[in-house]
Amino acid sequence: MRFSIATVVLSLAAMVVAIPTTESTLFARGGGQTCAQGQTLSCCQSVTSGGDGILGNLLGLNCAEIPIPIVGIVLGGKCNSAPVCCNVNGGSTSPDCDDNSNNGGTQGGINVLTNSCVAIPIVL
């Protein structure tokens, strides 16, 4: 009897899934939209060429318009560990992910608890 109870307890404990807290990896929640309606999740992969100064150019990331399926995937792998952001669909130019909002983008990644864009550390 004790063996059966111990087996059940161990089986239930093995079913718990832990999500790593590594800052460079983002996890999308499976089963729902991550970006707001009318927005697309994009990889931020190039630096801006605007007149924000050296620091602004290093931290001001442009999002390439790459639609990414966002249900149940690890975004860090899809975006090669680059930051991601939500952008309004449409438009002929790449959305801007930096914080000076000259093209209306949002710097950062997705908060899996609130489904909102958040700033994340950028590894240079």
Swiss-Prot record:
Disulfide topology: C35-C85, C43-C79, C44-C63, C86-C97
Endpoints of the signal sequence: 1-18
Location(s) in or outside the cell: Secreted; Secreted, Cell wall
Effect of inactivating the gene: Does not seem to affect germination and growth, formation of sclerotia, ability to penetrate and infect host tissue, nor spore and mycelium surface properties.
Alphabetical keyword list: Cell wall, Disulfide bond, Secreted, Signal
Physiological role: Aerial growth, conidiation, and dispersal of filamentous fungi in the environment rely upon a capability of their secreting small amphipathic proteins called hydrophobins (HPBs) with low sequence identity. Class I can self-assemble into an outermost layer of rodlet bundles on aerial cell surfaces, conferring cellular hydrophobicity that supports fungal growth, development and dispersal; whereas Class II form highly ordered films at water-air interfaces through intermolecular interactions but contribute nothing to the rodlet structure.
Family membership noted in the UniProt record: Belongs to the fungal hydrophobin family.
Descriptive protein name: Class I hydrophobin 1
Organism: Botryotinia fuckeliana (strain B05.10)
